[in-house]
Amino acid sequence: EENLDLFDYYVITPHFPLDAASQKRVLKILTRIPNRKLILVDHWMKELPGNYGAVYQDFANDAYEGLGYGLKKLKTCSRFNVVTLPSSLYYASVGEAVERFCRDNDIAVEFHTEITPEIIREKEVYLILNSQYDLGLIELVRRARELNFRVGRDISIISYNESPINEIIL
């Protein structure tokens, strides 16, 4: 609190852990900042009361709409697999959007917390959320190759947060 008058604005990207204790602590701190000085960037915190500035992405609607562009291809797959941790920032919004999209379009969906050989099955599609340093994508492709599956022919991968390394991995 002693620093609240030191700056004209506080620009915060609220990518905090989603567990209840962390969120409670973060909300307590953020509510101390006067609304006129607070600007949230990239992620909206619906739990934070007040009339503060915010510029954010609507991850849920963007994901839902993006999946719609691939609906025809998704309908050819027997299951939509999402690999993520429930504590990830993207799980809360993108995971919900994937569930809603699959329900609305009658597509089987399954959530996983890790990539194991058992979840890699032919004619299925995979989405990896929060893949740190693309390790999740690398692991998925490595395990698929061990099973003699080719990406694009035997399994499909939806890239979230596209990066140049995908060109090499895939």
Predicted regions and their residues:
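Short, solvent-exposed amphipathic alpha-helices that sit
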Residues: 62-69, 89-107, 139
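Short beta-strand elements of ligand-binding domains
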Residues: 12-14, 33-45, 152-161
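Hydrophobic alpha-helical segments within soluble ligand-binding/sensing domains
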Residues: 42-81, 136-137, 161
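Structural motif
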Residues: 1, 12-17, 42-43, 83-88, ...
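A short, well-structured beta->alpha microelement
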Residues: 1-2, 105-119
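Amphipathic helical "hinge" segments at domain boundaries
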Residues: 1-11, 96, 105
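Short, conserved loop/helix-junction motifs that constitute active-site signature segments
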Residues: 29-35, 74-75, 148-152
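Flexible loop/turn connectors
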Residues: 121-170
